[in-house]
Amino acid sequence: MPLVPLLRDEATRRGLLDAGERVTPAVAFRLVRDMPYRRASDRQPETVLREWQGTCSGKHYLLRDLLQELGLPATIIIATHEFTAENAPWLPPHLATEVRLAPVPDVHNFLRVQHDPVAGDWMTVDATWPAVARRLEMPANLSFRPGVDQKIACDPIEIFHVPDDEDPQAMKERIISEHAGGQAARRDLFITALSRWLATELGG
């Protein structure tokens, strides 16, 4: 089922889009970016859209499919990284204390988007943090401008391109197992606490 009409209908119902307003790549980016950072019941694009929430994986799986429907080829990227006091100074005290004890390993998703299929030019797109997270000094991307790379929501250690014929979530889970190792449960608790803090601070 095409996702762009579903996005338009859900965004209109929520008062985020004017009736009849056209969904462009920039509009799709804005709507997905501003979904609350919170895990949906699963990461299927339809679920993320229906529940209007997602973390970096669900948001970018949805945004990839939307952009492809709008004519822009897009590829899921996986990046290993760590939350530290130095690269995440915006963390609240209880989470800052956690990363000072030891960095929290994580695996992040973002996109590479072919914004000009004729010229073959690609750009980095990251819709992880809602725009309102800027007031918490988080690195949210405010605009989608063709040809302008967006800031990645982490400091990548290693980057992997997901092949078109591979399940991105299965690949991500393998990389989480390798990167987080025995800290996988700690990582999971950290992401849950981060989502709860953002829900308290930003609403949604």
Residues of each region from the PLM?
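Secondary-structure boundary elements
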Residues: M1-G54
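Solvent-exposed, well-ordered amphipathic alpha-helical segments
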Residues: M1-P2, V23, G71, H115-G120
